[in-house]
Amino acid sequence: MQIQFPDNDPQAIVKKLEDAMGGRALAKMVNFDMSGNELIVTISKLGTSTLHFKCDHTPKGCHFALSKEKIALAHRPLKGEVTEKIVKVIQKAGGQVS
């Protein structure tokens, strides 16, 4: 999975992602955070899954490429459904997913 944002400030992108989550139930389970040069998406409910995206700055903004994922056993059957919801949040925040 790859994500492209027109912004060049990763912290501003995290803020947009959090704002896009709003009051959804998903906001209680999903956390976006920057650690060094990585965007870390943490999903916590009946276990913890983490997705690590390496951040590269390009002339078009920030590009995030999935570099590592750890999916909790309880999350595996729901991976597709949760991924779709996270993609919608990313798109609502102004990002493009490929």
Residue ranges and their predicted role:
Residues 1-40:
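Negatively charged, low-complexity tracts enriched in Asp/Glu with abundant Ser/Thr
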Residues 22-25, 51, 59-62, 82-86:
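Short, low-complexity, polar/charged sequence segments that are solvent-exposed and flexible
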Residues 30, 59-66, 89-98:
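Short flexible/disordered coil segments
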Residues 34-36, 45-46, 57-59:
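A generic beta-sheet turn/junction motif
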Residues 46-50, 78-79:
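Amphipathic hydrophobic-ligand
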Residues 51-76:
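Intrinsically disordered, low-complexity regulatory segments enriched in Ser/Thr/Pro
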Residues 72-98:
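A conserved amphipathic terminal alpha-helix motif
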